[in-house]
Every structure is written in structure tokens, then in C-alpha cells.
């Protein structure tokens, strides 16, 4: 017999019918293989049930504090990234950083001082670290808070 798509069949014994339990005294009737009485005979044990000991979700400590709804999360851009994206220098604003894909739109931007900057740039952002401001001004640029 050749191996063709219309000749494919499962191997003998590979597919067995589902055993229907609790349907008469023939096979797996009455108690359906669950034994007699007890929680396991009646329905099912809850997934997180630990046999009566204190469950893990109650043993673990509660989290302290609260989530501050007014917390401002800044997107950060380092000086080496600005140097890489704007090698000719010039004015760099939040819109320019969004256009180049350095940050996402709609979130405040903070410029951090990792790396070096070799060109004079006029950077306007929502916040600057002290190191970033020093390095930008040392390279002949300016910083403006938006």
C-alpha cells in the first residue's frame, strides 16, 4: 500500500473511545472509580486547596504602602543617544526625539548624562540631570525646560 494522503489512518490502538463513567454497573458504574465518601468522591478538590493547612496566598506577607496616582514617569534619553541621533547639532526638542524614535509621544522626557556630547545642541525637555546640563553647556549648547 502506497503512502498517500487518502490512505493515512491512525495506528491500531492509537485512538481509544472515552470511558463514560457512572453509567450503570457494567464498567466504572456507581462510584465511577472514586471510592466511597469524602471530598474527592463528591465533586473535586479546589485547585489551591492544601489539605487544611494555611494556604500560601495567606501565609505570604501583604504588600506595604500604596500606588501614588500622581507619580510622574519620565522617559529617559542619554547624551550619547542625542549625539548619535543629531551628529550635526542644532535644536533638539521632544518632537524631534519622538520623530527619531528615541522616545514615545505623550510622556515627559528627562535627559541624563551618560556618555559624551561633542556638538553644540539646544535641547528642550521636561527635565535634565545636573550632569547632563553641565556636559551640554560645556559643549557649547543650551538647556531649556519645557
Curated annotation (Swiss-Prot):
GO BP, one annotated term: translation
Annotated spans, Disordered: 1-39
Assigned GO CC terms: cytosolic large ribosomal subunit
Pfam families recorded: Ribosomal_L27A
Protein's UniProt keywords contain Phosphoprotein: no
Molecular functions per Gene Ontology: rRNA binding; structural constituent of ribosome
Alphabetically ordered keywords of this record: Ribonucleoprotein, Ribosomal protein, RNA-binding, rRNA-binding
Highest taxon listed in the record's lineage: Bacteria
Task performed by this protein: Binds to the 23S rRNA.
Subunit structure: Part of the 50S ribosomal subunit.
Protein family (similarity comment): Belongs to the universal ribosomal protein uL15 family.
Name of the protein in question: Large ribosomal subunit protein uL15
Protein species of origin: Nocardioides sp. (strain ATCC BAA-499 / JS614)
Lineage: Bacteria, Bacillati, Actinomycetota, Actinomycetes, Propionibacteriales
Amino acid at each position: 500500500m502506497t503512502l498517500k494522503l487518502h490512505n493515512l489512518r491512525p495506528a491500531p490502538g492509537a485512538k481509544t473511545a472515552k470511558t463514560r463513567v457512572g453509567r450503570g454497573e457494567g464498567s466504572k458504574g456507581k462510584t465511577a472509580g472514586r471510592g466511597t465518601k469524602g471530598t474527592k468522591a463528591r465533586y473535586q478538590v479546589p485547585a489551591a486547596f492544601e489539605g487544611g493547612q494555611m494556604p500560601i496566598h495567606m501565609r505570604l506577607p501583604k504588600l506595604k504602602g500604596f500606588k501614588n496616582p500622581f507619580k510622574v514617569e519620565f522617559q529617559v534619553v542619554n547624551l550619547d543617544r542625542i549625539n548619535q541621533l543629531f551628529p550635526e547639532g542644532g535644536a533638539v526638542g521632544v518632537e524631534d526625539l519622538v520623530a527619531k524614535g528615541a522616545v514615545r509621544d505623550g510622556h515627559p522626557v528627562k535627559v541624563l548624562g551618560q556618555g559624551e556630547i561633542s556638538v553644540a545642541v539646544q535641547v528642550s525637555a521636561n527635565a535634565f540631570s545636573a550632569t547632563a546640563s553641565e556636559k551640554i553647556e560645556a559643549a557649547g549648547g543650551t538647556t531649556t525646560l519645557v
